[in-house]
From Swiss-Prot:
EC number(s) reported in the record: 7.6.2.-
Membrane topology: Peripheral membrane protein
Ranges where the ABC transporter domain occurs: 2-243
NCBIfam families according to UniProt: PRK13548.1
Xref: Gene3D superfamilies: P-loop containing nucleotide triphosphate hydrolases
Protein name: Hemin import ATP-binding protein HmuV
């Protein structure tokens, strides 16, 4: 389990997180939502160990995150940030293969290449493998980088270990088809034994795919629970200042947020 225990963080006088308690278990997709500036990306960075926390601790499998070496962490969790650009002209295949570093001591090159082929096919980027990454569209870059982090945790899944995948706004540059496809991939990875944390803005996507939702506001947890417990008219009004409700018609494949005018 990956946990934040009473975590607070600030930069200068700006408080980013205030006494956050959070957890994600194996076989679970947890979605973090909230308005701009709510602390979503800051919480994800804290869970990754990328920002200094002023209070509390982050634990992975009941061990302090700070006690892990960089190499061992790379085998246990993969992170996709909002900044997925690269300055060098790597091919798509080379970008995905960067994930092999974490596992090259335990797997043959042929096995690792098989993992790369699997995730590229799953994310529909195989046809781009010889293309230069810097020449791709924003959505294509995002899918390639997601393929890289999925490739990083794939060996741990095969070995029946429990990896964690943390992804920050993985659907921000994607069309509607690929938004649902990416979230379906995240859900699939969770069903295979991983713990997945995703920061997303689309509340309908959150309702459709999340096992649990954390709603943040002003650096605090405003609510947490299953989608129907969190996406209530009262909370949507208080946190987002919108009049809306969660529609979950059994005749429809996916629940969605209905605005009330």
């Amino acid at each position: 389990m990956l946990c934040a225990n009473n975590v607070s963080a600030q930069i200068g006088q700006k408080k980013l997180l205030k006494h956050i308690n959070f957890y994600v278990k194996p076989n679970e997709l947890v979605v973090i939502i909230g308005p701009n500036g709510a602390g979503k990306s800051s919480l994800l960075k804290a869970l990754c160990g990328d920002i200094k926390i002023n209070n509390g601790d982050i634990t992975l499998n009941d061990r302090l995150l700070s006690d892990y070496s960089i190499a061992s962490l790379a085998t246990l969790r993969a992170v996709l940030t909002q900044n997925y650009e690269l300055d060098f002209p790597f091919s798509v295949a080379e970008v995905v293969d960067m994930a092999h570093f974490a596992h090259q001591a335990d797997y043959s090159k042929q096995q690792l290449m098989h993992f790369s082929e699997q995730v590229m096919q799953a994310l529909s980027v195989t046809h781009l493998k010889t293309h230069t990454f810097t020449q791709l569209s924003g959505g294509e870059k995002q899918r390639v980088q997601l393929a890289r982090v999925l490739c990083q945790i794939q060996p741990s899944l095969v070995a029946n270990k429990t990896p964690y995948l943390l992804i920050d706004e993985p659907t921000s540059s994607l069309d509607i088809f690929h938004q649902y496809d990416v979230m379906a991939q995240a859900k699939s990875i969770a069903s295979q034994g991983a713990g997945v944390v995703a920061v997303i803005h689309d509340l309908s996507l959150a309702a459709s795919f999340a096992d649990r939702i954390y709603m943040l506001n002003n650096g605090e947890v405003a609510a947490c629970g299953i989608p129907k417990e969190v996406l209530t008219p009262a909370l949507l009004k208080r946190v987002y200042n919108i009049n809306a409700r969660l529609e979950n018609n059994t005749s429809e494949a996916m629940p969605h947020i209905q605005m009330c005018y």
